[in-house]
Amino acid sequence: MRITQDVFQKMRDDGEKIAIVTCYDASFAALLERAGVDILLVGDSLGNVIQGEETTLPVTLDDMIYHTLCVKRGASTAFIMTDMPFGTSQVSPEETFRNAAELMAAGANMVKIEGGSVMAETVEFLTQRGIPVCAHIGLTPQSVNQLGGYKVQGKTDYEAEQLLEDAVALEQAGAGMLLMEVVPAALAAQVTRTLSIPTIGIGAGKDCSAQVLVLYDMLGIYSGKKARFMKNFLTGAGSIEEAVQNYTRAVKTGEFPGPEHTF
């Protein structure tokens, strides 16, 4: 039986950390599930690591449907979260619902939508109609052109206050989880204390309810500059499955992320 969203709320309430890894195919879905990963994120990062694009912007809804179907076939119990790609959640709540419904039909248990309080109306529209939503704030890769590149968000007092306001608005709109990407650890901790829903961090410190890494980054498969929040868990492991087990254990015990992975 597949894990449901309420399990993660209880884990958050009990102080139990949640381990998340991106996943794009059936074989890795089965492996990640065996290794104890709680949530499989079908990320639009597939544009970077699978398609070879510089950004996630070219990824289409059909791409996300295809990879969600693949992951669903490989995982029997793990919770599946799927990104809504660029252009599929920005036009109107009604159009977003139609697109999200296709992802849910493909096997997603929750969709992830990038954007702050401007997306609150859309989040509310979806959640009131049975589609669970994870909101995504901080560094939102789909807005990389507007943000001026991949850099830390929430560094100034004004930016930090805005992100906190965004987080509260999105929870009030019905978001079941909130992902924060590349924000100062102290700010992520403040948001986590303020909200009652699970928070997910990537480059956001150890105080979030959950941690997520891109599968390829976790296995040391990357080119170019290594991001600060990355850690190669394959180093010293005897197999890929053992590497994932080491990651899951490090998240659950609070060993990862360390100070060297945060801002």
Swiss-Prot record:
Q: Where do the catalytic residues lie?
A: E181 (proton acceptor)
Fetch the InterPro entries from UniProt. Answer: Pantoate_hydroxy_MeTrfase (IPR003700), Pyrv/PenolPyrv_kinase-like_dom (IPR015813), Pyrv_kinase-like_dom_sf (IPR040442)
What Pfam families does the record tag this protein with?
A: Pantoate_transf
Pathway it works in: Cofactor biosynthesis; (R)-pantothenate biosynthesis; (R)-pantoate from 3-methyl-2-oxobutanoate: step 1/2
Reported cofactor(s):
Mg(2+)
One of the record's GO cellular component terms:
cytoplasm
Q: Could you say which protein family the record assigns here?
A: Belongs to the PanB family.
Organism expressing this protein natively: Nitrosospira multiformis (strain ATCC 25196 / NCIMB 11849 / C 71)
Subunit text: Homodecamer; pentamer of dimers.
The catalytic activity of this protein is classed by the Enzyme Commission as 2.1.2.11
Q: Where in the cell is it found?
A: Cytoplasm
Sorted keywords for this record are: Cytoplasm, Magnesium, Metal-binding, Pantothenate biosynthesis, Transferase
User: SUPFAM superfamilies from the xrefs?
Assistant: Phosphoenolpyruvate/pyruvate domain
Q: What is this protein identified as?
A: 3-methyl-2-oxobutanoate hydroxymethyltransferase
Q: Name one GO molecular function term.
A: 3-methyl-2-oxobutanoate hydroxymethyltransferase activity
**PANTHER family named among the record's database cross-references:** 3-METHYL-2-OXOBUTANOATE HYDROXYMETHYLTRANSFERASE (PTHR20881:SF0)
Q: Which chemical reaction does it catalyze? A: 3-methyl-2-oxobutanoate + (6R)-5,10-methylene-5,6,7,8-tetrahydrofolate + H2O = 2-dehydropantoate + (6S)-5,6,7,8-tetrahydrofolate
Name the top EC class. transferase
| One BP term from GO | pantothenate biosynthetic process
Identify the domain of life: Bacteria
Cofactor, how bound (note) = Binds 1 Mg(2+) ion per subunit.
Indicate which residues the UniProt annotation says bind 3-methyl-2-oxobutanoate: D44, S45, D83, K112
